């Protein structure tokens, strides 16, 4: 065990640099705003800075931990299920995994509290069932080779059809649920399952089908919540603004964070437990992994646990109040339009601090053998999230319905999926669920809510929906990246015969005569 920990130290230093590169730009933007056009109290500023430090250390531990534990666990379970060639086992285990992972997701409790007209346990069980069913569908799609765009057309048509019967006050919360339930705990494991399943297939489309699980798992919660909204006539949602902290000295600052720490210690333990138990059962029954590999996975799980606890503590206690207060200050100024470019700038950088984005970018680079680099993927995600936050701020300032953005956005994204290479489509729809993680929920959403309070808007209809917008735009930007790559490849191929002819002519002697 000591050897494993020592060997991981160089990797921790590497992950620390990555975390600093992700979080420092956000901290710099907020500090510039605080010392210029959006003054905040020392309490909020100190909480934000300590929160940023915890997020940096949290990302460092989580990214290495997920690489050492969640990814190999998911890949081995996925490979084992595929090798079994037992359809009933795949369906049963797939549903159970989706259900248990989702039911323990901390953000699902937050979503349930926002919809008082639906009993909490009813909503949680329904959403978990939705994820379980759609994870099974995702497995079957991969095994049967069903094109992802075909399924997306059917499911999103059903979503927008149901949306016509749901009270407008409930729409934004319902669409947010798709991003909320694919959190940093579930995404790495689910994506690794997909890689494990496709690795057993030997056909040429196996790599294309490595992704797409998160895409379909994001559909289940939206459908489940929309159906509940119709059944329970959920015309009301609630909003509890975050408490703005007041600390007098450094001791009170530490007490504020240490009091919240036990909550996240318990939440992450609850989230991690079903995955560990399921993997333990697979290990005893079928996997039989050697002790050294198990030790590495165990150390990785500890890193993952420490990382997520630190990350969520820093994000919820440090970032959430700062985001809300900044939104109120910026929205209360005469030049409210500044919310749009500032929101876009923050959105561009904040997605780089999403824990699961690191896992996605790394898996994309590995599965494509470097054809899609982590840097290229990150740039496409940043552009998408930047656009989505800008549009979200337009909604806050104008009160435009979220459907005016979601319907054209999804229509365009699904339309181009029929001409874009399959792999890019699957990655794009996975990226939507990955990008809308805890940083969106704890900073971007409070920023929009604070601005909405300042402009006197309806928080439930105008501010909620940021998560849904963030989940939508990467579908477009990543696929456009794929379309550009495809056009470049075609252009290069068409130019190749001309180059070959030129080379042939160059080899001929000067006095050669070619008769036509």
Short names for language-model regions:
Residues 1-19, 23, 74-88, 202-213, ...:
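Intrinsically disordered, low-complexity non-transmembrane regions of multi-pass membrane transporters
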Residues 2, 138-153, 169, 173, ...:
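Juxtamembrane and boundary regions of transmembrane helices in multi-pass small-molecule transporters
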Residues 46-47, 65, 112-124, 142-157, ...:
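Transmembrane helix-loop boundary segments of multi-pass membrane transporters
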Residues 14-22, 46-52, 80-88, 148-153, ...:
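Alpha-helical transmembrane segments and their helix-start/interface "positive-inside/aromatic belt" motifs
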Residues 24-37, 51-61, 93-100, 130-141, ...:
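Hydrophobic core segments of alpha-helical transmembrane domains in multi-pass membrane transport
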Residues 78-80, 87-158, 336-417:
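Helix-loop-helix junctions within the multi-pass membrane cores of secondary transporters/permeases
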Residues 243-356:
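Transmembrane helical segments that form the transport core of multi-pass membrane transport proteins
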Residues 32-46, 66-74, 100-115, 134-146, ...:
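Transmembrane helix-loop junctions in multi-pass membrane proteins
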């Amino acid at each position: 065990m000591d050897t494993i920990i020592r060997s991981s130290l160089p990797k921790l230093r590497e992950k620390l640099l990555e975390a600093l590169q992700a979080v420092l730009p956000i901290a710099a933007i907020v500090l510039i705003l605080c010392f210029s056009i959006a003054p905040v109290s020392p309490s909020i500023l100190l909480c934000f800075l300590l929160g940023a430090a915890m997020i940096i250390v949290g990302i460092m531990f989580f990214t290495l931990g997920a690489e050492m534990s969640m990814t190999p666990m998911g890949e081995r379970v996925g490979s084992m299920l595929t090798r079994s060639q037992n359809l009933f086992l795949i369906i049963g285990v797939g549903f159970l995994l989706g259900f248990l992972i989702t039911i323990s997701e901390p953000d699902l409790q937050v979503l349930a509290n926002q919809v008082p007209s639906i009993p909490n346990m009813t909503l949680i069980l329904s959403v978990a069932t939705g994820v379980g069913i759609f994870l099974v569908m995702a497995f079957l799609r991969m095994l049967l080779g069903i094109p992802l765009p075909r399924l997306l057309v059917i499911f999103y048509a059903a979503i927008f059809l149901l949306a016509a019967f749901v009270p407008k006050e409930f729409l934004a919360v319902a669409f947010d649920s798709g991003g909320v339930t694919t959190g940093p705990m579930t995404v790495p494991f689910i994506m690794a399952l997909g890689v494990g399943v496709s690795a057993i297939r030997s056909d040429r489309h196996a790599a294309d089908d490595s992704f797409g699980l998160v895409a379909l798992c994001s559909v289940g919660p939206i459908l489940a919540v929309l159906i509940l909204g119709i059944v329970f006539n959920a015309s009301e949602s609630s909003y509890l603004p975050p408490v703005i902290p007041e600390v007098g000295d450094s001791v009170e600052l530490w007490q504020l964070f240490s009091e919240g720490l036990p909550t996240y210690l318990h939440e992450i333990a609850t989230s991690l437990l079903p995955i560990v138990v399921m993997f333990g059962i697979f290990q005893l029954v079928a996997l039989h992994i050697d002790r050294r590999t198990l030790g590495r996975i165990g150390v990785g799980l500890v890193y993952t646990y420490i990382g997520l606890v630190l990350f969520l503590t820093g994000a919820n206690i440090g970032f959430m109040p700062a985001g809300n207060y900044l939104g109120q200050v910026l929205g209360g100024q005469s030049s409210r339009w500044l919310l749009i470019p500032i929101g876009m700038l923050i959105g561009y950088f904040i997605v780089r601090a999403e824990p699961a984005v690191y896992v996605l970018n790394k898996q994309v680079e590995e599965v494509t053998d470097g054809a899609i680099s982590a840097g290229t993927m990150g740039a496409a995600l940043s552009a998408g999230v930047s656009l989505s936050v800008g549009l979200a701020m337009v909604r806050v300032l104008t009160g435009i319905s979220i459907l005016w953005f979601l319907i054209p956005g999804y229509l365009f994204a699904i339309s181009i999926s029929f001409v874009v290479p399959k792999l890019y489509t699957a990655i794009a729809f996975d990226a939507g669920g990955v990008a809308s993680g805890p940083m969106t929920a704890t900073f971007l959403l409070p920023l929009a809510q604070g601005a909405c309070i300042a402009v006197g808007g309806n928080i439930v209809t105008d501010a909620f929906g940021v998560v849904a917008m963030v989940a939508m735009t990467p579908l477009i930007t990543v696929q456009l990246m794929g379309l550009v790559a495809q056009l470049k490849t075609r252009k290069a191929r068409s130019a190749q015969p001309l180059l070959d002819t030129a080379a042939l002519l160059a080899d001929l002697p000067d006095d050669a005569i070619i008769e036509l």
